[in-house]
């Protein structure tokens, strides 16, 4: 089989589970060596081992607090020490919290920006010279609430909107430096984080988590919830030579749940 990413090196933040792990797995299936980053060393080690076993591609990892500058710098340094190269950056770290706005503490907004937004900005900047040298690509995992605000997801919506805006500006820089930049807007996707959201809403509404899931599918007119692999398939395509003319674009993977036309 012709593996379209053979020889490429990819850093995937949030790579120990969920969408990040699915992206790392699909990248490795296409021949890329992957470097996973998140805060939990045990999950990272397990994820890395699974990828190696299933794909026979090299997989390494680094545990760090990506909310802070030192964690991002350590991750970038560890990546370069291990592979001495970076072709692909997937910023997938960061699960922001939903909630009732008047009851949400300031720390939840600050934490959301620190992990999801600032880590993407910092790692993009730190690795930009390497990505420029290799005509690489950046894919940011954003989210539909960046374009469709919700009173129940104000923190995530604000963080995602900022990341989407940054992504477009970064794409303009990428035109100058030959770095492809795109971003993806997942809809409701089956992950541990989504299950936590369903359980929280269930407690608030005195329902079962599966009832909240059914209501979500029905209210958005979906056939089903998304799977992490749905997002990962698009991410891998956007990293491939076949997608090189797709640049500076946000694409939804939400089963048609977006209400707007863009």
Model-predicted segments: where are they?
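Alpha-helical segment proximal to the catalytic Tyr-Lys
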Residues: 129, 172-173, 244
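Short, small/polar-rich loop/turn modules that mediate ligand/substrate recognition or access, typified
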Residues: 175, 180, 246-248
């Amino acid at each position: 089989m012709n593996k379209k990413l053979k020889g490429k090196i990819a850093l995937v933040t949030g790579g120990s589970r969920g969408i990040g792990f699915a992206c790392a797995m699909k990248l490795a299936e296409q021949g890329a060596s992957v470097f996973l980053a998140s805060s939990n060393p045990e999950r990272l080690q397990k994820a890395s081992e699974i990828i190696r076993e299933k794909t026979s591609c090299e997989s390494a990892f680094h545990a760090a607090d990506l909310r802070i500058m030192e964690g991002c710098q350590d991750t970038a340094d560890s990546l370069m020490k291990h592979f001495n190269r970076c072709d692909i950056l997937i910023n997938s770290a960061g699960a922001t919290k939903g909630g009732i706005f008047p009851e949400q503490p300031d720390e939840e907004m600050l934490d959301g920006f620190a992990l999801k937004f600032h880590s993407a900005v910092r790692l993009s900047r730190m690795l930009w010279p390497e990505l420029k040298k290799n005509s690489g690509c950046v894919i940011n995992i954003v989210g539909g609430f960046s374009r469709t605000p919700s009173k129940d997801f104000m923190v995530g919506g604000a963080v995602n909107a900022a990341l989407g805006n940054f992504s477009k500006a970064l794409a303009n820089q990428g035109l100058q430096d030959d770095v492809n930049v795109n971003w993806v807007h997942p809809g409701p996707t089956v992950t541990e984080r989504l299950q936590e959201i369903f359980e929280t809403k269930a407690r608030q509404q005195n329902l079962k988590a599966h009832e909240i899931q059914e209501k979500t599918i029905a209210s958005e007119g979906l056939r089903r919830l998304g799977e992490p692999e749905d997002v990962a398939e698009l991410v891998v395509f956007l990293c491939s030579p076949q997608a090189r003319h797709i640049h500076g674009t946000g694409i939804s993977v939400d089963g048609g749940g977006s209400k707007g036309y863009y």
